[in-house]
């Protein structure tokens, strides 16, 4: 068990306590917050509040949390869309909705579970038992190319390329709004949001983050972009585009909370991956097509023009 202390902001006044806790405590769902309240694990200025308590402002909250149990990664027979594979690396086209590795709340059904079944013992151990072979990640509701290493030498080589930006990742997305320029760069540091611990944000003192973008097509109220990452921060493209006023279509975290009909996630797809092969040093360049949902949305937009 461990305890955290929280002081609500002025903007939190009137918010239900369970909702506030789910926003401010990383990994805590609203239902889990409600259970903590019911079990007396939350105090407000030293007293246990009622389950319907709303933030008044200025109070001090104390939350006692049980230690999270890390799920064990086990092989699972989950179909994989393998784009490239050899004795050193495997590149997969990850579908929307698939989490990369097991974590509290997502104990199985992840890419790691699928890779363990597909590759057997042939995965790098550098990522540890929970993340074998994983060199980089993409969000659950982002689709596209992700690379995993089959041995430690390959993992170290790819991680070095990721650090010096020679492992290039290209994305396509549909962003809300119209861009005046044809291309640009967002250079803004990213860190954990101070108002919602589940979100990232552009914050002073955050980690350096650079995203390059270019316009592929313009539609009424929506722009089709290609984005290239110079760094790889959590939710980077989503945060940067929201920061400049153009959140990704379907992103209910950093954009409009109302889901977009026809989309099960944000319209963001990792279309391209370029790296030097860890064994031969030869360049490898891979692409994968946009998913059906993305294509259907493009077709709808094209019909409006």
Model-derived features: positions:
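Short flexible coil/turn linkers enriched for glycine and charged/polar residues
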Residues: 86, 140-141, 167, 207, ...
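Short alpha-helix capping/helix-loop boundary micro-motifs
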Residues: 45-50, 221-224, 259
